[in-house]
Amino acid sequence: MKLSGVFTALATPFRDDLSLDERALASFVDWQISSGISGIVPCGTTGESATLNFEEYCTVVRLCIETARGRILVIAGAGSHCTTETISRALFVQSAGADAALIVVPYYNRPSDEGVYQHFRAVHDATNIPIVLYNVPQRTAIDISNDTIRRIAELPRVVGIKDCTGAERVAALKAILPEKVAILSGEDETALASYMNGGSGCISVVSNVAPKMAVELYRLHALGKINMAKQVSGNLAALSRVLFIEPSPSPTKYALSLMGKMRPKVRLPLVELTSSGQTAVKNVLETLDLLRQQKAMHSQL
């Protein structure tokens, strides 16, 4: 498996009573597929995995796989700060038919680099599913070294890394990682720079809201149309900034509610977007013409 393209870090729809909205989720996945993305990543940070119980987690993963029906890749979030729990989740997504498991660096415990390596090795050795390493120090409080990333990447079924430390690191990782390992940007604002430094794709938050735009950025870079790509990148950066104006994924869910994709509901300890945040999100969506495009699409159905 060689990962490339745009993968959406999928938001999880909730009803007004905060139960899972399975119908909205299936519809949302279909829309993502029709918009041209390469894959979806359910049950990650944007999917509020921290507030899903295990039954809900399993439901989301199964529904995404069933809805995708092999049309795109499904890389299911399976990470935890507990190695045995991570193994249990990875075994579940393997049995459910996911294409790969996204495994975050253990958070809260703050292990050493050797502890991080042993965590990934234990998960790898207990499963048979391809693994994508997720390095996000702003949430885990650990930024593992390039050497440790290389050691993890040498495990046979590690096929990618989602790195959220900036585009500058991509070239250094490209030089030391095996060819089988895709480097995926975890930062929409620097996705183009990541591609230009040798990155293979992006696991994107903004593609929840603007999947076609995120795919277009990837396509333009692949075609060598860098000036046009820079224009699209500027628009995506503006959208990305407003989608993190308050704790994520509250701004993303509000944007999707304006587009008729899901309710803006999030689970505590997250709260819905403030009125000032709502105004900021709506202004950017209108500036980028995303609301009009969505209304036009619905009018054609």
Curated annotation (Swiss-Prot):
Site entry (Part of a proton relay during catalysis), positions: T45, Y108
PROSITE patterns (UniProt xref): DHDPS_1, DHDPS_2
Pathway: Amino-acid biosynthesis; L-lysine biosynthesis via DAP pathway; (S)-tetrahydrodipicolinate from L-aspartate: step 3/4
Annotated residues for binding of pyruvate: T46, I203
Protein name, as recorded: 4-hydroxy-tetrahydrodipicolinate synthase
Sample GO molecular function, one term: 4-hydroxy-tetrahydrodipicolinate synthase activity
Pfam families reported for this sequence: DHDPS
Entry's family note: Belongs to the DapA family.
Protein purpose: Catalyzes the condensation of (S)-aspartate-beta-semialdehyde [(S)-ASA] and pyruvate to 4-hydroxy-tetrahydrodipicolinate (HTPA).
Gene: dapA
PANTHER family: 4-HYDROXY-2-OXOGLUTARATE ALDOLASE, MITOCHONDRIAL, DIHYDRODIPICOLINATE SYNTHASE
Organism: Anaplasma marginale (strain Florida)
Catalytic activity: L-aspartate 4-semialdehyde + pyruvate = (2S,4S)-4-hydroxy-2,3,4,5-tetrahydrodipicolinate + H2O + H(+)
GO CC, alphabetical: cytosol
Cell compartments where the protein resides: Cytoplasm
